[in-house]
Regions:
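Helix-loop "lid/cap" segments that line or gate small-molecule binding pockets
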Residues: 52-55, 73
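Histidine- and aromatic-rich ligand-binding microenvironments
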Residues: 7-8, 41-42, 95-97, 118, ...
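Active-site neighborhoods of divalent-metal-dependent phosphate/nucleic-acid chemistry enzymes
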Residues: 75-115
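A generic structural signal for short hydrophobic patches within well-formed alpha-helices
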Residues: 12-13, 46, 121-122
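Anion (oxyanion) recognition and catalysis
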Residues: 33, 70, 108
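Short, well-structured N-terminal submotif of metal-dependent ribonuclease cores
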Residues: 1-41, 54-67, 136
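Acidic, PIN/NYN-like endoribonuclease modules and their adjacent C-terminal/linker elements
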Residues: 2-4, 104-136
Length: 136
């Protein structure tokens, strides 16, 4: 079974903003392109990315960037009943935002490491994580 990873919005932004941790995320993308790893991108991370982009750039630029991200070697994961239930369980037991509960729950469902920069995920017990340098 190939190693699996879920990209949090912060991991995507690490690439787009050329932040610390860039090399680690680029390595994961390269490995996924070579079928060495499986990368998942939750629909909720795409939604977060879209609203953040819309605050900074035009709608046309936003759509272009989203198309670029969707072209990465990632599996964009849409909602399922099982995923919704897992997210609700996490949200009911932790202080995570709704979006972060969705994203964390996908990692648990796929037995994947969550690639992120968000210390809030520390509240989720047994969540496998590939932590990027936290923002200060």
């Amino acid at each position: 079974m190939m190693p699996a990873f879920v990209l949090d919005t912060s991991a995507v932004l690490t690439i787009l903003n050329r932040e610390e941790g860039l090399d680690a995320v680029l390595t994961l993308l390269e490995r996924a392109k070579d079928d060495q790893d499986v990368l998942y991108l939750p629909y909720m991370a795409l939604m977060e990315l879209e609203y953040l982009l819309l605050r900074r750039v035009s709608p046309e630029e936003t759509l272009a960037i989203l198309a670029l991200v969707r072209a990465w070697p990632v599996h964009v994961q849409e909602s399922t009943e099982e995923w919704r239930h897992q997210a609700a369980m996490i949200k009911s037991q932790t202080p995570l935002s709704v979006a972060d509960a969705w994203i964390a729950s996908l990692a648990l469902l796929h037995h994947a490491e969550l690639v992120h920069k968000d210390p809030e995920y520390e509240h989720v017990p047994d969540l496998p994580m590939a932590k990027l340098p936290y923002k200060v």
